[in-house]
Amino acid sequence: MGFKGTTVIAIKKNGKTVVAADGQVLFGHTVLKSNAIKIRKLLNGKILAGFAGSTSDAITLFEKFEEKIKAKGDGLIDIKRAAVDLAKDWRSDKILHKLEAMMLVADSKNILLISGTGDVVEPEEDVISIGSGGNYAYSAALAYMENKKLSAFEVALRSLKIAARVCIYTNSNIVLEEIENE
């Protein structure tokens, strides 16, 4: 899937988890909005989620993901299980299968990528990025992660700024959300 017009990154470092995204929204070759918010806090801020792709599709997926977590009913939050359940539904459901988006979800312990092809990926490093500028942000973040003085917040911000400099579909209006790791 090649989505144009966004970059989203998730980072875990030094006891913090950050999900950040740029704010650009394109309609064809036109920038319609430069300050869109593409990340959400779910379950009273215990989970962060970001998306690349269609906004309405992403909102549907956020809702479905939250339903999967709540469906367990025991009060425990298991984003891995919820991600796998969502990916299964996304791939097999005739309506969900048509949704065009990718998601990053993170809690205090995990960072996951969920795609409509049924993929649920937990990165080897504590960094993952999606969207048109995803590879640029990811590469920058891997380099910045080696600097022990930089926080997760600073790594995410600097990485997205690099992506915005080289990806024409990414801008530098960056929104970041952060949670403390347990």
From Swiss-Prot:
Matching InterPro entries: ATP-dep_Prtase_HsIV_su, Ntn_hydrolases_N, Proteasome_sua/b, Proteasome_suB-type
User: Where, in this chain's numbering, is Na(+) bound?
Assistant: A164, C167, T170
What does this chain do? Protease subunit of a proteasome-like degradation complex believed to be a general protein degrading machinery.
Protein name per the record: ATP-dependent protease subunit HslV
User: Anything known on activity regulation?
Assistant: Allosterically activated by HslU binding.
Q: Catalytic residues?
A: T6
Identify the GO cellular component terms for this protein: HslUV protease complex; proteasome core complex
Principal cellular location given in the protein's record: cytoplasm
Keywords associated with the record: Allosteric enzyme, Cytoplasm, Hydrolase, Metal-binding, Protease, Sodium, Threonine protease
- What Gene3D superfamilies does the record point to? Glutamine Phosphoribosylpyrophosphate, subunit 1, domain 1 (3.60.20.10)
Matching PROSITE patterns, A to Z?
PROTEASOME_BETA_2
Superkingdom in the source lineage: Bacteria
Please list the GO biological process terms of this entry. proteolysis involved in protein catabolic process
Q: What is its EC number?
A: 3.4.25.2
Q: Where in the cell is it found?
A: Cytoplasm
Its recorded reaction(s) are: ATP-dependent cleavage of peptide bonds with broad specificity
